[in-house]
Each structure stands twice: as C-alpha cells, then as structure tokens.
Amino acid sequence: MLFRSYNLFPHKTALENIMMAPIDVLGQPRAEVEARAHELLKKVRLGGKESSYPGELSGGQQQRVAIARALAMRPSLMLFDEVTAALDPETRKEVLVTIRQLVEEGMTSILVTHEMAFAREIADHVYFTDHGVIVEDGPPAALFGAPQKERTRAFLEQVL
C-alpha cells in the first residue's frame, strides 16, 4: 500500500529502506534482498540513488523508492492511495510512468486518484465515489464517455 506521504525512514538510504522489510519481516537472506533492491531501484528509474537519503531526493523520487519498497515484498496487489497528490506536475509524471509500467507488466492495482485522464487510460474498471459512497462504476469507456449519474457528469466536466 502506498500513500501520498512516502513514509520512508529518514535515517536510512534508499537501498536500506527497500531492504528492511524483506529481511526483518520475511527473514530473507541479506544478499538476495540487496540484489533485488538494486533491481527494483533500476525498475523505478532510480539506479545510482542507492546511497541517497530521503531528504536528498525529490518528492517523486521518494515516492518511487516507496513503490520499490512495496514491490520488495512481492505483493500480488498494489494499492495506490492518492500517491500523486502532493507532487508537482513533473514529478507526478515520473510516478505515473512507474505505475503505468507496473500495470502493463500485469500487476493488479487499485488506484485512488483524482488523475482522471490517467485512470481512463490504465483502468479496467472505474469507481466514482463521493464522500466515500460509490456513485457510479463501470468500464472506463462507459463511465467517462457516457456517465449515467448527474454527480459523475458534473465532476468529469470540471476535471476533463
């Protein structure tokens, strides 16, 4: 699960942040975990940042370290909760590219977002909620192309 706040340990490097849970929680061998952590940093386009501390990284880079950290646990599902909310447009794009790559590789994902254009592109199914209540759901083409509910239409007119 990833949130808008990165929740990285500030006193640990990017590599150490990624390695911690597989070693401490899963009991995996350090050498194996370290090799995987290096691979994951390359996967999220942060190769060469292994020794960087969170405070030395941009918001988008920190979010991608958080994604790599989650992937280190080999999840079958990723939950992204407003992961681009606090990011500027350039770093937002970096994170969205990473999420798109994971989806294209077959990672099952649940994405809570206000990035409607992105959701329309990558989602198999979209749920539109208002104050925690599902207002409407369906395939992206139907929901974005011909929303049935007035609340959905009004929102989409404002953001698209």
Question: Where on the chain are the PLM-derived regions?
Answer:
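ABC family nucleotide-binding domain
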Residues: 1-140
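C-terminal boundary and immediately downstream tail of ABC-type ATPase nucleotide-binding domains
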Residues: 130-131, 135, 141-160
